[in-house]
Amino acid sequence: MLNKMTLHPQQIMIGPRFNRALFDPLLVVLLALQLLVVAGLVRAQTCPSVCSCSNQFSKVICVRKNLREVPDGISTNTRLLNLHENQIQIIKVNSFKHLRHLEILQLSRNHIRTIEIGAFNGLANLNTLELFDNRLTTIPNGAFVYLSKLKELWLRNNPIESIPSYAFNRIPSLRRLDLGELKRLSYISEGAFEGLSNLRYLNLAMCNLREIPNLTPLIKLDELDLSGNHLSAIRPGSFQGLMHLQKLWMIQSQIQVIERNAFDNLQSLVEINLAHNNLTLLPHDLFTPLHHLERIHLHHNPWNCNCDILWLSWWIRDMAPSNTACCARCNTPPNLKGRYIGELDQNYFTCYAPVIVEPPADLNVTEGMAAELKCRASTSLTSVSWITPNGTVMTHGAYKVRIAVLSDGTLNFTNVTVQDTGMYTCMVSNSVGNTTASATLNVTAATTTPFSYFSTVTVETMEPSQDEARTTDNNVGPTPVIDWETTNVTTSLTPQSTRSTEKTFTIPVTDINSGIPGIDEVMKTTKIIIGCFVAITLMAAVMLVIFYKMRKQHHRQNHHAPTRTVEIINVDDEITGDTPMESHLPMPAIEHEHLNHYNSYKSPFNHTTTVNTINSIHSSVHEPLLIRMNSKDNVQETQI
C-alpha cells in the first residue's frame, strides 16, 4: 500500500499539471510573502507581557513595572508609550526605531542619566517627549536629531547645570519647552534659545535665576513663567524682542525694584502676575504702554502707600474697578495699613511736583555727529518724556530711526541733521504734576566738498599807480597775507595795500589736503620701494653667480691649457754682411754651462730648433730672456 502511495521523482516531474503547480517557484514566493505579512501583523498586534495595551495596541502603558530598559514586543501601531516611574538609566541607540507611528513618549520619573545619540531614531512623528524628574546633567542635544515634528519637550526637575548655546537648535518645530525646577542650573548662555523661533511657551520657574536670560530669539513667545527665582530687579530691555508675549508670571521671585520702562517692549501683554514679591512702589505710568493689559496680580507685596502710588490707584480704578482681590493692600504707613490701593486718593497725602536735578544744557554740534540731551529727576519713580521742536511728544519705546529716549530719560541722537535744530523740552511727571526744562540744539551744516586733486585759489592783486610803477619796477609787488582755512578749500589772499583798483583772477593749484598723503598712496609707495629692493637683490645675485662661473672657467683654463706650438718670427732691420743667408747673430755668453748649446740664433730659414728636455731655467739680469711654451710634443724657445 505504501509503495502505491509513493510517487517516483520522475512522476512528479512529468506528472499532471496539479503536481507541477504544487512546486511552481512563483507560488513558493507568494507563500513566503504571505508568511512575512502574517508575521508582521502578529508583531504589530503584540503587547509586552508586563504592559497593558488598549485601543488596538495604539496605547501601551508600562507604568511602575521596575523596567531597566525599554521592553521588547511593542506594537508598531503604538501611538502612546508610557514608561513612567521605572528604573531605566540609559536610553540606547535605536531603542524606538520600529515605532514610526509613535506620537507621545513618556519617560518621566525614571533614573535616566544618559541618552545616546540616535536614541530616538525612527520617531519621525513624535509630538511630545517627557523627560522630567530624571537624572540628566546636560541637555541631550544630539539625541534630538530627526525629531522634525516634536512640539513639546519636558525637562523639568533634572540636575542640569548649564544650558549652552544652540542647545535646542535641532528641534526648531518646538512649541512648548518646560525647563522648570532646574535647581542646579548656574549658567544660561546668551545663545541658549537660538533657533526656537516657533516657541510659544517657556517655563523657567524655580531655576535659581538671578537675572532674566537673553530671550530675544523667542519672537513668537506667548507665555513666560519666571516664578520662584531670585530676580531682585527688573530692568529695561529684559524682555526685548517679546512683542507677542501675552502672559507673564513672576510669582514669588523676590523682586524688590521694577525700573522705569521695564515693560515697554511687551506691547501685547494681557496678563501679568507680580504677587508674592517684595515690591513697595512702582514707577509712574509703568503700565501705560501696555494697551492690551487686562489682568494684573499685585497682592502679597509690602506696598508703601504714599504720593508715588497714587497713579497706580487711579490706573486700577480705570482698568479693574470691581476686582479688589487682584491688587493688594497697603502695608505702610500704619494709618493706611490694610487699605485697598484702589481706594486711595490725593487727599490722603501732601504731594509735590517732581524736581529736575540735572536739566538739559544747550548743545552745539556738527551735522552727522551723535548727540545727547540729559534730563535727570530726583527720583526714578517719575516718568520722562521729551517735546521736540515740531511739538511731537517722545517717550521711551517710541523709537524713531535716529532719535530715542533712553531708559534714564536721556534724549539720544545717533546722527543729527540740520533739521534737528531747535528747542527740546524735557518733561518729568509724577502723580501731582509735571516739571519741564528746555535746551537748544544747534546743528551746523558740515562742508561737503567733493574730492578733487585741484582746488581753486582766489588771488586779489592791485594795479599800482604810475608813481608806484616807477619806484617798484624791480619789485614783485606787495606781499599778500595768506589765510589758509582748513574747513574750506577756497583760500583768500588779500594784499596789504588797497589804494589801487582791485582785480581778481583764479589760479588752479594743487589741493591743500593732498599735501598729506593718504593711506593708499603710502601703501603704493611702500610696495614700489619693496619691489625695487627685491629686483636689485635678484640682479645682484644673478651677477654674482655669473661672475663666479666665469672666474671658475678662467681658472680652469689656466691650469688645463690645450697643447699648442708657439712660433716666434724675428724681423731684423737691415743687417750688413756678405752672405745674409749664412750670417749668424752672435749671442751673449751664458754663465751657466748647461745652457751653452744655445749659443747662436739661426736665420728664419733655419728656425726650427727642437729641444727634447729642459728641467729648469734660471733667469737673471745677466742671462738672456727665454720664452717657453709647454707642449706635449714640441717646445720652441728663443733668446732675445
Swiss-Prot record:
| Single GO molecular function | cell-cell adhesion mediator activity
How is it placed in the membrane, per its record?
A: Single-pass type I membrane protein
The record lists the membrane-crossing segments as: 528-548
Task: State the disulfide connectivity.
Answer: 375-426
Q: Which SMART domains match?
A: IG, IGc2, IGv, LRR_TYP, LRRNT
Every copy of the LRRNT domain together lies at 45-76
Top-rank lineage group of the source organism: Eukaryota
Q: Where are the LRR repeats?
A: 77-98, 101-122, 125-146, 149-170, 173-195, 198-219, 220-241, 244-265, 268-289
Q: What are the subcellular locations of this protein?
A: Postsynaptic cell membrane
GO annotation, cellular component aspect:
glutamatergic synapse; membrane; postsynaptic density membrane; Schaffer collateral - CA1 synapse
The main place the protein resides is membrane
Point out the signal peptide segment: 1-44
Q: Which UniProt keywords apply?
A: Cell membrane, Disulfide bond, Immunoglobulin domain, Leucine-rich repeat, Membrane, Phosphoprotein, Postsynaptic cell membrane, Repeat, Signal, Synapse, Transmembrane, Transmembrane helix
Show the segment(s) annotated as Disordered.
463-482
GO BP annotations, alphabetical order: modulation of chemical synaptic transmission; regulation of axonogenesis; synaptic membrane adhesion
InterPro entries hit by this protein: Ig-like_dom, Ig-like_dom_sf, Ig-like_fold, Ig_I-set, Ig_sub, Ig_sub2, Ig_V-set, Leu-rich_rpt
Note the subunit structure: Interacts with NTNG1 and WHRN.
According to the UniProt entry, the note on domains is: The LRR region is both necessary and sufficient for the interaction with NTNG1.
Q: What does this protein do?
A: May promote neurite outgrowth of developing thalamic neurons.
By what name is this protein known? Answer: Leucine-rich repeat-containing protein 4C
Which source organism? Mus musculus
What gene is behind this protein?
Lrrc4c
